[in-house]
Amino acid sequence: MRTFLLVQLDSEGAPYSEIAELLEDAGFRPHDGGYDFVYDWGRAPSVRESLDLADRVQATLKGKSVYFRLESADE
């Protein structure tokens, strides 16, 4: 399973390069297509693990003026 991440930046917030570095440090990789980043679980995560990942993304982006959307899919 993979979790896709779409980010929306504010012009008054952190630069995209900083956001990308933070997300890559959190285990996400840049993604070509309709999403900006992808997290590859390598297996089906539990609901708790999915919620923990969302919490980590929120904590990582806190104070950076970034909105985000997560979506998981089997692929």
Residue ranges and their predicted role:
Residues 1-4, 10-75:
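Long, contiguous binding/interaction regions
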